[in-house]
Amino acid sequence: MTRPFVMGLTGSIGMGKSAVALMLREMGVPVFDADAAVHQLQGPRGPLLPAIEAAFPGTTGPEGVKRQDLGARVFGDADALRRLEAIVHPAVARMREAFMIEHMGEPLVVFDIPLLFEKGHGKDLDAVMVVSAPAEVQRQRVLARPGMTVEKFAHILSLQVPDAEKRARADYVIDTGLTLAETEGQVAELVRAIREKNPRG
């Protein structure tokens, strides 16, 4: 059975990563969403709730992890963050492995990983796709979000690898500063090329 070509998908805040992930799904490409996996693990009756509650008492409830409370406990505390990651990361890795097994005959699978470069998650990937748009487009998109401020946006950017560096480290760059149709055309061409090189097995 053919092993899929494994593509990482990433990009800074406001660059259109979610839109590109949706395009890929609509083209029949299996996409593993790392953020969604974490939400599932930490949501109502999530399998990680007992371990998180034991490590950080008072941060979980019937609806799952109390994200603000847990965030306050680990923000600025490197040791606490390491303890949380030691609980979460192995569980996400197991979900990734199950996803790969499920889609082993596919020509292409994509792992949607927001902090791919920041957390060093690129080791098991065949290539990385970065979504990018001009800085002013990014700024307009992000500041249009409910509750977003210039200060919050600046803080988030300070924690992320700069867009220019992501572009330089990418194997493929998708320009999302264009129309949706033009962006979709770029994605479709890339998917077609990979499927031709790595047919379904």
Swiss-Prot record:
Catalytic reaction(s) noted: 3'-dephospho-CoA + ATP = ADP + CoA + H(+)
Residues reported to bind ATP: 14-19
NCBIfam families documented for this protein: dephospho-CoA kinase
UniProt function note: Catalyzes the phosphorylation of the 3'-hydroxyl group of dephosphocoenzyme A to form coenzyme A.
Protein name: Dephospho-CoA kinase
Family matches, as PANTHER family: BIFUNCTIONAL COENZYME A SYNTHASE-RELATED (PTHR10695:SF46), DEPHOSPHO-COA KINASE-RELATED (PTHR10695)
Cellular localization per UniProt: Cytoplasm
Pathway stated in the Swiss-Prot or TrEMBL entry: Cofactor biosynthesis; coenzyme A biosynthesis; CoA from (R)-pantothenate: step 5/5
Family matches, as PROSITE patterns: DPCK
Gene Ontology CC entries for this record: cytoplasm
EC number: 2.7.1.24
Cleavable signal peptide: none
EC class (word): transferase
Chief localization: cytoplasm
Organism: Novosphingobium aromaticivorans (strain ATCC 700278 / DSM 12444 / CCUG 56034 / CIP 105152 / NBRC 16084 / F199)
Family: Belongs to the CoaE family.
CDD domains reported in the protein's UniProt record: DPCK
Alphabetical UniProt keywords: ATP-binding, Coenzyme A biosynthesis, Cytoplasm, Kinase, Nucleotide-binding, Transferase
Chain's gene name: coaE
